[in-house]
């Protein structure tokens, strides 16, 4: 049985997960409709669709995993099925971070304004940059996946033999976990760099506008601000997501604190949920589609 606080926290986390599924499904449907209507899928819509689909899978996997651990259903679930879920999560999580980073790079190349020849080369050859990101995804995935397999195998051994914990140092567990996530972490660092460069670009642009005596925000400034909101939100939420997964992992190995585990689940569910709604609110097309959907719902009610 769960305590009152545990039940409330689990309800909050579950609500986050369901809202995340709805928000990301909405993004997929809007972009799919646009694809069918225009007979083509733009680069930004491809990234947003891939990001939304990967997050839907992420939400279902972390929710199912959390419920099986909270209600001790892992004993009833075949170990091979749980292991398979873990491998799927590793792949989907990597893809989700890659799509988020690609979105940040897309905003950076489209909006930022630098005179450096490397930036100008990247801006003119955005398609090649996209191919490079795919290669980077494969390399980081191949580098981190073997360690992820080791961590998953360690969890499987631990669940079948609790005395194994004696041979595992806390520092070793933490190091293995961090290195197993080096792929997503390296992509996350690229997103931070893109956000930092966008900030510099905005600062330079603001100084330029002040020097010509303009007291109003122009379209370039608005574009900078929207892109930075998306990137900063991603950075903050991904840190919370990473901490949440880390808390869940440490609870599995080092303590049997169910409340702390559910708190970790609540943190991890915030990232795929909240960021999807931030994307909707900062995208003109998605915001317009949301308003149309709300108007239709009002018409149905009347």
Curated annotation (Swiss-Prot):
SUPFAM superfamilies: Family A G protein-coupled receptor-like. The chain crosses the membrane at residues 8-28, 44-64, 88-108, 129-149, 183-203, 230-250, 260-280. It comes from the Eukaryota. GO terms for cellular component: membrane. GO terms for molecular function: bitter taste receptor activity; G protein-coupled receptor activity. It is found in: Membrane. Residues 29-43, 109-128, 204-229, 281-302 are cytoplasmic. It is a multi-pass membrane protein. InterPro entries: GPCR_Rhodpsn_7TM, TAS2R. Glycans are attached at residue 161. Putative taste receptor which may play a role in the perception of bitterness. Several bitter taste receptors are expressed in a single taste receptor cell. Belongs to the G-protein coupled receptor T2R family. This is Taste receptor type 2 member 104. The gene is Tas2r104.
């Amino acid at each position: 049985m769960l305590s009152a606080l545990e039940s409330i926290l689990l309800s909050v986390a579950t609500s986050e997960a369901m809202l995340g599924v709805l928000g990301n499904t909405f993004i997929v449907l809007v972009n799919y409709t646009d694809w069918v209507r225009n007979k083509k899928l733009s680069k930004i819509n491809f990234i947003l669709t891939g990001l939304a689909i990967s997050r839907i899978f992420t939400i279902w996997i972390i929710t199912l995993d959390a419920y099986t651990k909270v209600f001790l259903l892992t004993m009833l679930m075949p170990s091979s099925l749980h292991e398979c879920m873990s491998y799927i999560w590793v792949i989907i999580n990597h893809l989700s971070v890659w799509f988020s980073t690609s979105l940040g790079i897309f905003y950076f190349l489209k909006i930022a304004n630098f005179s450096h020849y490397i930036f100008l080369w990247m801006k003119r050859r955005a398609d090649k940059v996209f191919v490079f990101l795919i290669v980077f995804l494969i390399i980081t995935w191949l580098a981190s996946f073997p360690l992820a397999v080791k961590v998953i195998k360690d969890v499987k051994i631990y669940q079948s033999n609790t005395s194994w914990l004696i041979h595992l140092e806390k520092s070793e567990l933490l190091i293995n976990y961090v290195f197993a996530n080096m792929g997503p972490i390296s992509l996350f660092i690229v997103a931070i760099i893109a956000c930092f460069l966008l900030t510099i670009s905005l600062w330079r642009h603001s100084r330029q506008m002040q020097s010509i005596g303009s007291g109003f925000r122009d379209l370039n400034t608005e574009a900078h601000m929207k892109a930075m909101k998306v990137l900063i939100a991603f950075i903050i939420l991904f840190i919370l997501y990473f901490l949440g997964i880390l808390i869940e992992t440490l609870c599995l190995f080092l303590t049997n604190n169910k409340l702390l585990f559910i708190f970790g689940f609540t943190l991890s569910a915030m990232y795929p949920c909240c960021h999807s709604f931030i994307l909707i609110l900062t995208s003109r097309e998605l915001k317009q589609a949301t308003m149309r959907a709300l108007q239709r719902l009002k018409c149905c009610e009347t």
